[in-house]
Amino acid sequence: MFKFYLDEAGEREILQQMFSGWSGCSVKERALQYGIPLDIARQCEKTDVPCPALADYLAKGYVLYRKELKQALTFHKRYWREHRLETKEKLKNIFGHKIPPYTVRLNLQCDGISNWYGTDISINAFQYLR
């Protein structure tokens, strides 16, 4: 869930368009792909009218998402401060001579948290944690 990380309204708008059935992909496939319950996704099918069930589901999910993101970023800062030298050596062995960029380091520690377009996660993190 939350593959696009725009904001709650932007996420809902994109998912609504995808579940409307006009994208050439079945609603069931899209629901599985984005982790949305099938019964909620089916309510969005063949319509451009905003679906209240999808909005409610995303609103509940964003509460959990904010908590998880905040925890991940806190861990990220502490992890790199406390384990910097040992971690740098391990990463040099994996990536070669250069240390990977911030987004790659965060992705390694946060099990792949990133946004759809590969934009720096910190921009999105600050947006959600305001």
PLM feature spans:
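Helix N-cap / beta->alpha transition motif
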Residues: 7, 122-125
